[in-house]
């Protein structure tokens, strides 16, 4: 396992981050959950943790409650890095407000059964809200000792820049992390467009049009926590570029909406070619491509079997040449 450091956090952070929005973990906190459901969730988390993955991605509406129970049962909170998110819109309104930021963070602390969140992110942004209000609210949580570091998920780099300029001007702590979509697959449509009814849409830094975004991250050193790094199963190997229509049987609606397009099918075809040449799996090639980028970067994924977990870890050691990296991304 490879680890990195981020400013403000003493713990090592695994470059593979386990995404907790996965069926076994949802089942464990469902109203009809059984003891067996909890045991299955704990077993998955045990396997992830024993493999060296110590960083877990949660949010106000997934992962927190079961993570809190598991860490309490295993007495390993100090060994885990918890990334969680708040201020996601609901069906009625935008929730990127100082009230909701503070409220969600305090709720998260209770569900996680902890007194401090390692990495706290806002799940969405809203340009209707002055950035100063947001920075002040996050700094209040920081000064109260409730969060160690913070940033934004689905924030543009320009908005992060604005936030950090405000922080510098007012002697406050800046954003040090960001979680946009990033991976080999180009995100061609907002997978959760309904969520953008009140807040800003999802943010991706994938594809040729986002080169300036990636350059900014490389230059600033702000760590990227890349969500949907394998495009919600597009590079799972469960379907091939020869029969791409099989994706409709494998992927959910968000995955199809976000990633099913001719250019990504071609990227999949090229992954398949390299996977055969190197004797590895398609998902490993796609992950290796991510880790070949010139950014401080961690990749979020939600493997559900021991084999998938260790395949992902092995992908970190798979080296791609400069030409292979370009070729996979359709830069011929």
Spans of model-derived segments:
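N-terminal binding-site loop/beta-alpha segment at the start of enzyme catalytic domains
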Residues: 1-80, 143
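Acidic-and-aromatic substrate-binding clefts and catalytic sites of carbohydrate-active enzymes
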Residues: 57-66, 89-95, 125-130, 157-160, ...
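Active-site groove signature of glycoside hydrolases
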Residues: 109-130
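Beta/alpha (TIM)-barrel catalytic core signal, keyed to glycine-rich beta->alpha loops juxtaposed to Asp/Glu
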Residues: 130-332
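Short catalytic-loop micro-motif centered on adjacent basic/acidic residues
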Residues: 54-59, 121-122, 148-153, 179
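A short, structured active-site edge motif that brings together acidic residues
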Residues: 78-92, 178-182
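Short, acidic/polar
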Residues: 33-47, 96-112, 161-165
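Active-site mouth loops of central-metabolism enzymes
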Residues: 23-39, 86-100, 123, 127-128
């Amino acid at each position: 396992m490879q680890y990195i450091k981020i400013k403000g956090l003493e713990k090592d952070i695994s470059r593979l981050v386990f995404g907790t929005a996965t069926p076994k973990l949802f089942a464990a906190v469902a109203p009809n959950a059984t003891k067996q459901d909890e045991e299955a969730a704990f077993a998955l988390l045990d396997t992830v943790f024993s493999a060296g993955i110590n960083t877990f991605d949660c949010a106000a509406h997934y992962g927190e409650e079961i993570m809190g129970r598991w860490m309490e049962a295993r007495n390993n909170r100090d060994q885990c890095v918890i990334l969680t998110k708040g201020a996601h819109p609901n069906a009625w309104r935008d929730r990127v407000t100082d009230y909701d930021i503070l409220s969600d963070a305090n709720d998260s602390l209770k569900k996680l059964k902890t007194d401090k969140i390692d990495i706290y992110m806002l799940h969405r942004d809203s340009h209707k809200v002055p950035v100063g209000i947001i920075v002040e609210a996050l700094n209040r949580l920081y000064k109260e000792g409730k969060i160690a570091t913070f940033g934004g998920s689905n924030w543009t780099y320009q908005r992060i820049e604005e936030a950090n300029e405000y922080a510098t001007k007012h002697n406050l702590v800046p954003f040090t992390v960001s979680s946009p979509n990033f991976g080999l697959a180009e995100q061609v449509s907002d997978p959760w467009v309904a969520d953008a009814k009140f807040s800003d849409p999802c943010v991706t830094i994938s594809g040729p049009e986002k080169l300036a975004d990636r350059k900014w991250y490389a230059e600033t050193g702000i760590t990227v926590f890349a969500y949907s790094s394998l495009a919600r199963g597009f590079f799972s190997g469960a379907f091939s570029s020869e029969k791409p229509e099989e994706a409709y049987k494998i992927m959910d609606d968000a995955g199809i909406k976000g990633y099913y397009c001719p250019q990504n099918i071609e990227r999949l075809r090229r992954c398949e070619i390299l996977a055969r040449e190197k004797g590895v799996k398609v998902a490993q090639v796609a992950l290796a491509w991510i880790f070949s980028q010139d950014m401080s970067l961690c990749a979020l994924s939600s493997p559900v079997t021991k084999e998938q977990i260790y395949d992902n870890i092995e992908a970190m050691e798979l080296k791609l040449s400069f030409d292979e990296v370009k070729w996979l991304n359709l830069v011929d």
